[in-house]
Amino acid sequence: MNPLAARGPHRVTLATRADCSVITLTGDMDLDHVGPLRAALQEACTAPTAPERVVVDLSRLDFCDSAGLNALLHARSLCEQNRRTLTLTDPGPQFYRLLRITGADALFDLSYPGTADGWPDAAR
């Protein structure tokens, strides 16, 4: 397991593959749990040897507040500065609603691999 991973039901794991870095979020991502996410995003978005593509897997995320969203917005900026791409995959209804309410849905590359057309039911 990656040393950046937080312990307990709220976890952040970073796995580096040949073509991308994958950050998986589990549980809640709020002010109390955002530190490991920031560290993983910093590494994936700025490390000289990291792949050019960063994927954040949200399929196990139960809740996200403004602290988690802020970390992802900062990561988007870091990726742009370092010529990397950032994709958020499989966001659930709560997170997708947070993106829509804040207008951040237009800022991120969103992927829904579990649907036939790549879009969530909420976006139709």
Model-derived features: positions:
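STAS-like cytosolic regulatory interaction modules
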Residues: M1-D62, H74-R124
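ABC-family nucleotide-binding domains
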Residues: D65
